[in-house]
Amino acid sequence: MIRFNRWKLMSEALELLGRATSIEAALEVLRAHARAIGCADGVTVVRRDGAEIVYAGEDAVAPLWTGRRFPIEQCISGLAMIERRPIYIPDIYQDARVPHDLYRPTFVVGMAMFPLGIGDPVAALGVYWAKENPAEPDALALLDTLARSANSTFERLAIAREIAESRPGA
């Protein structure tokens, strides 16, 4: 039943991404659907701002870092953006890249980060679990597909914005 629900949620998310008229709307689709698709305890949307990242939104069992900023090289979301690839960490306390002091007060034990944006990623989708080695391969594959679909949405929105700005009188 979980697998069916994941696919149903994925289908809904893809439809909503296809209708999104702003980056903010697309990010909201990600935030609202990723947690259920991944059977996760929390999700965050992290935006790149120069050499920093800012936690722009979250849906989690307990507060994480909404509104806080961190140097891009010192967090997994930043590394996923820099490396332009998803990062899955089944146990954050076994991975030296994770700033353990920042995570100790939270529920997070396992996590995955998915970069968002074509070319140079502009954001990342963070998915968090309260247990070690939590993610099923199906869930990770669907979350990766969701992030890639969001990338297509971001590209479509950027092209639409460029066209609108190039019109006389715009």
Describe each PLM feature range.
Residues 109-117:
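A short, aliphatic-rich beta-strand micro-motif
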